[in-house]
């Protein structure tokens, strides 16, 4: 297979949703139908002690939530698939935003009963701003929920994008038995079993007037389906690949990830429609995947994927050229040359050494602290710099200190490693050695930080909430003593040794900015 053929078969996408819409369960079922796993272990399956493959961190297994981005790779029907399962919890939206910088399309999971929710709306806007094509999977249709036409209206009213159902549920609300593929005009009836979604479902397929289909669902249901399809054909939008690519139209699919209903038809159609690796913008201009010079960027740092060794993995999206094990690259931010000798690919914590990888692929690099989120690696002869990632100012602050001074070394090591992941901001106070000030977007980030220090570094810590809600930086080298009106501010220093002013509220932050133009 030529390099160009390898690039064309890549599909790299993220799955986004509001918490509890079923994002991680859908990820798991795509792995099941893709042949990457043989039994799905949903976070709901407590009795059998199986957990989602993508939820690999211990706290995720205990709480049944995703707080990290997982990278999952497998082959299916000639495609090399890279799925990035993102944190569902709103407190970890920054990790999700960074992950979206590394994908070529996104799958938006919507709960049939709730429609478009707040977090979905935020993540949709990020995709829209970046021009990422969005595919919609309406989940949980084995439960009572909104009418499919109402969901189409909801997507347009809330998100401002038209939808084009690629399939349509067969049955009555809350009791759907199959889906109708509008392109092939085939009905797919799913035979329910008692396996609770851990195995593939048996499917009966046929035309709408086939005897086998009529006997399974009944003539009345099929008559209602015909009415819906007629209305769709008259009033709905036809599929338009150009509009999908521009983010003006979202292909829409129906199913239930928990029971495997509609998962395989979605996967196969998605791979047919989803974009190949796209061109990327750099400060020097646009680079194409087929360009021969190697380039990539770091979009995520993860400490302790192997807690026994306290390792640190930097996840890189390859953008151009061919990656080969042992390649020597320029680290654009430091100007140093780095040899990438231990590249890995992942199915959550399971790893495989990479000999070769192509644009669209996500690989993990063992890192000793040289790489950071947003960094560029490239060939020295063809230097490029990828555009900076968005930064989210923290809104909650706390003082973090070890319970025992005997654990100070482990404490410093743990805080340093976890801070490099980017979910928590760490600040130092002048002349204060025994504690740090930490900032986060949400409370759960504090809880996860505390949990991981205690369980991965064996350091019990104290977290003291502080009454600050805003952080501000100055432009240029202005010393704190020259600023007017910082009496209510706490002055701390970030990892680049820049002064940061923590303030009680946004009003005082605005007032400080006015007094110091």
What are these regions (language model features)?
Residues 1-517:
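Structural and coupling elements of P-loop NTPases
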